[in-house]
Regions:
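Conserved phosphate/anionic-ligand binding catalytic regions in large, soluble enzymes, centered on
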Residues: 11-12, 46, 120, 139-161, ...
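Ferredoxin-type iron-sulfur electron-transfer modules in oxidoreductases and energy-metabolism complexes
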Residues: 14-37, 55-77, 122-141, 167-178, ...
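Intrinsic disorder at enzyme termini
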Residues: 78-108, 286, 293-305, 313, ...
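Gly-rich Lys/Arg/Thr-decorated short loops/hinges at beta-loop-alpha junctions or inter-strand turns
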Residues: 107, 112-122, 173-185, 288-293, ...
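Accessory "access/gating" subregions that flank catalytic or transport cores
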Residues: 125-165, 321-322, 327, 335, ...
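Histidine-anchored nucleotide/phosphate-binding helix
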Residues: 192-206
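Hydrophobic alpha-helical positions that pack around
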Residues: 224-350, 362
Length: 508
């Protein structure tokens, strides 16, 4: 008997460790031979802990489980009060296009043998048979763009590093996932770390880098542990090291843990932190692709960007770019959070409308009240009202509506949320997290909080000042922290003017 219990941090917070232990003890009491596999999460967080039992028909899902539900797993499974049916037949799973997350929740995350049985290392083996320039071209042709926020074409970044002449080059994975409503990086590192390792190794082969670093945050102890264990296993198996899979070509990597500063999610601030310096933003140029880590050419890519590379190298650029629309190609790992009925991770091709994502996939609000707004792209993302729910989920369509996709985290809010308070929170967040290097961000965010406090106290005449301030921050900040903070502020002003006028009425 084989039973799967998630080791994902969200599942553990909801009691999956206790459920796993209860299954082991119950099996021992009954004298039944049971293998408990600690897998990654399937992404249905509202059903965690989600336990799966392997049957002749496939894996049956049960959830949300607690310790008291365990004994019934050893009886008639179909009659179990928490039985949900076959996992792959659940509506949440059937509607997805899982490419990057195809193995998450399916395999034992630290079993290299299981990883290979599910298309693992095929992309790396294909890459080893190609010239570096051909690997770069394949990634370029796929249309893959940065999944961390900027949406910059991955192939162009790789080509810049490939063409640079230097005695040492580096691959740096930005796993400093600090945005609200984002957890895809963590879920992948915990549930399928070999995919990230394979993607980084391919990147190294493509650009001539022999050393890689995964920079993640101290708030992710489980992800750090999983990545470190997986790297050791990969190194012992010859996937990493002086001769990758016996090819004679070298690539190795390690995990570095940051202290949790939000601004270290910005690539140059991250590189400073990685070098042991204060995490402050560098002026550009020079670009990290030319002078990055230790002044050497460096590829800095997000976890999901790098984890998307193995499937591209396995199945080809043409296969990958058949998903999506326009210049937004491939799939995106949507993360639904906030006041949402069905929160979790949902991987799908670009192109669904925001309304389909919030209403059909997310099921609306958990409170049952009407959806008022959705913030897309973390704390620096714009707030979208229901009137814009027909917007297709692509980089271009969101940019046309003065928004951004960012890391594809969606925070849903119902009609009780005051958007003036949300605008103030955005400015306050920027003030707290600013590295302090540039004046528009350091001073602008403080003045922004003060200006919004005037509005809160019934002075709408401060709104033109707020608009000018946001324009200054947007155009003058060194990085996206100050440059993108105007998105949530101005979208709240534009789409929810009643919330700003209400403060004046209350003051009077």
């Amino acid at each position: 008997m084989r039973i799967y219990v998630p080791l994902d941090a969200a599942a553990k917070a909801l009691g999956s460790d206790e459920v796993a232990e209860a299954i082991t003890q119950e099996a021992k009491t009954r004298g039944i031979d049971v293998t408990v596999v600690r897998n990654g999460s399937r992404g249905m967080v509202w059903l965690e802990p989600l336990v799966e039992v392997a049957t002749d028909l496939g894996r049956m899902a049960f959830g949300p489980m607690d310790v008291g539900d365990v004994p019934a797993l050893f009886g008639d499974l179909a009659a179990h009060p928490k039985a949900l049916g076959l996992t792959e037949e659940l509506p949440w799973m059937k509607r997805q296009t899982r490419l990057t997350f195809a193995r998450v929740g399916v395999i034992d995350p630290l079993s290299l043998a299981e990883y290979e049985l599910h298309h693992g290392l095929k992309g790396l083996r294909n890459a080893l048979a190609m010239e570096p320039a051909a690997i770069v071209k394949e990634v370029t042709d796929s249309g893959l763009r940065g999944r961390g926020g900027a949406g910059f074409p991955t192939g162009i970044k790789w080509k810049t590093v490939h063409d640079a002449q230097a005695p040492q080059k580096y691959i740096v994975c930005n796993a400093d996932e600090g945005d609200s409503a984002t957890f895809a990086d963590r879920m992948l590192m915990e549930g399928d770390p070999f995919t990230l390792i394979e993607g980084m190794a391919i990147a190294g082969l493509a650009v001539g880098a022999t050393q890689g670093y995964v920079y993640t945050r101290s708030e992710y102890p489980d992800a750090v542990s999983q990545m470190q264990k997986a790297i050791e296993i990969a190194r012992a198996a010859g996937v990493l090291g002086a001769s990758v899979l016996g090819s004679g070509r070298s690539f190795d990597m390690e995990v570095r843990v940051g202290a949790g500063a939000y601004v270290c999610g910005e690539e140059t601030s991250l590189l400073n932190s990685l070098e042991g310096k204060r995490g402050i933003v560098r002026a550009k140029p020079p670009l990290p692709a030319l002078q990055g880590f230790m002044g050497r050419p460096t590829v800095v890519n997000n976890v999901i960007s790098l984890a998307s590379v193995p499937v591209i190298m396995d199945r080809g650029a043409t296969f990958y770019k058949n998903f999506g629309m326009g210049r937004s190609l491939g799939t995106m790992a949507l993360q639904l959070a906030g006041n949402v009925k069905y929160g979790g991770l949902f991987e799908t091709a670009f192109g669904l409308t925001l309304g389909e994502i919030v209403d059909d996939i997310g099921g609306g609000t958990a409170s049952g009240r009407p959806v008022k707004a959705v913030q897309v792209g973390g704390p620096l993302g714009a707030w979208f009202p229901r009137g814009l729910f027909d917007t297709p989920f692509t980089y271009e369509d969101f940019a046309a509506k003065d928004g951004l996709i960012g890391h594809a985290g969606l925070t849903i809010a119902d009609d009780t949320v005051d958007m003036l308070q949300m605008a103030r929170f955005a400015m306050e967040f920027c003030a707290i997290e600013s590295c302090g290097k540039c004046t528009p961000c350091r001073i602008g965010s403080i003045r922004g909080v003060e200006t919004l406090d005037r509005v809160l106290n019934g002075d709408p005449s401060a709104l033109p000042i707020l608009t000018d301030l946001c324009n200054t921050m947007k155009l003058g900040s060194l990085c996206a922290l100050g440059g993108f903070t105007p998105y949530p502020v101005m979208s709240a002003v534009t789409h929810f003017p009643d919330d700003f006028q209400r403060a004046k009425a209350a003051a009077e």
